[in-house]
């Protein structure tokens, strides 16, 4: 499924649901903190990274706040279109990944393939509208 970013109609990712959607569960907001298990590959299948060895918040869990500037736009878009408990495969075009930058084995203009499982939303913050 093509998922288009509401903030930029030219920005998109491709998502394939593996397990889900768990529609009775929450969907994170842009300010939520999420717990995700992931495997990252280049589009050609070359393994790049995984949350497997992260132990800080539980076995293999990567915790992040979705409005963190350190996250790529495609990750944020994918996770905000998942329910807690969902597993998806996501193709992220280079424009929503690292763009023209390189990072380790990720070369400029690289599309990325993530396998994501949204394990939990430990902090479901609501947007602060100046209150």
Describe each PLM feature range.
Residues 1-131:
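Cross-family detector of peptidyl-prolyl cis-trans isomerase
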């Amino acid at each position: 499924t093509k998922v288009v970013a509401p903030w930029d109609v030219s920005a998109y990712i491709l998502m394939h649901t593996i397990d889900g959607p768990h529609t009775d569960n929450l969907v994170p907001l842009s300010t939520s903190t999420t717990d995700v298990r992931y495997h990252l590959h280049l589009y050609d299948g070359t393994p790049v990274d995984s949350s497997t060895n992260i132990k800080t918040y539980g076995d293999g869990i990567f915790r992040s706040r979705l409005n963190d500037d350190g996250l790529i736009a495609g990750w944020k878009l994918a996770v905000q279109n998942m329910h807690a408990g969902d597993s998806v495969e996501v193709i992220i075009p280079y424009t929503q990944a690292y763009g023209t930058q390189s990072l380790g084995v990720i070369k400029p203009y690289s599309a990325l393939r993530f396998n994501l499982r949204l394990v939990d939303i430990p902090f479901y913050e609501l947007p602060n509208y100046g209150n």
